[in-house]
Design a protein with these regions (language model features):
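N-terminal secretory/targeting leader peptides
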Residues: 1-28, 37, 44-196
Length: 196
């Protein structure tokens, strides 16, 4: 499992796939990102860089959590320091809102929030929980502004080391795991949204 944004930081050129508001709900995600042209184009770009994007999974829509104040209008974002991934589209989005984006690694996010380096976090509710920051966040704003995809990926070298039968079995298992992960991650995120 690897987030497409993580792959972008290594190979570049993938940022078009998560432009703000390009996809606004999971029906669109399923049609274009999981089963459609976005998946097809990402798969080609991965292959051009020696990677096999075996099956799409899930990383959910990005939201904004912070410890300072509720966000009821764009003006409320002014001056908030928000942890974002090292993705230009995320940084530009928060800059346009008047916030101060801070590109900080996922592994350093909790410490940055606890130390006051940032006031908030941009990520999915599911990932905020996984990062350990959801319990620290006082206010969640459901922006749903950007879908963040992921995939089960392997190197071309590993893929080519398998027989055709092994590749088919690997692909089937990856497709099943991706579908299972999407279903459970979306259900878990919906449960978390109902309590935040």
């Amino acid at each position: 499992f690897v987030a497409d944004m993580g792959v972008d930081s290594a190979i570049g050129g993938l940022g078009w796939a998560w432009l703000p508001f390009m996809l606004t709900d999971y029906d669109q995600v399923d049609e274009y990102y999981i089963n459609g042209w976005i998946n097809d184009e990402l798969t080609k770009q991965y292959a051009d860089n020696g990677l096999i994007r075996v099956a799409p999974t899930e990383n959910c829509f990005r939201e904004c959590g912070n410890v300072k104040r509720p966000i009821n209008s764009m003006a409320d974002m002014t001056g908030l320091k928000i942890r974002v991934p090292e993705t230009q589209a995320c940084q530009d989005f928060y800059t346009a809102l008047g916030a101060i984006p801070a590109a900080i690694a996922t592994s350093e996010t909790l410490a940055a929030l606890e130390q006051g380096t940032v006031d908030g976090v941009d990520n999915s509710i599911y990932n905020m929980k996984s990062m350990g920051v959801l319990e620290k966040i006082k206010y969640i704003t459901m922006l749903n502004y950007m879908y963040s995809g992921a995939s089960i990926t392997c190197s071309e070298e590993f893929w080519n080391s398998m027989t055709a039968n092994q590749q088919a079995a690997f692909k089937q298992a990856a497709d099943e795991a991706g579908a299972f992960f999407r279903e459970n991650m979306r259900a878990d995120e919906q449960d978390r949204k109902s309590v935040v």
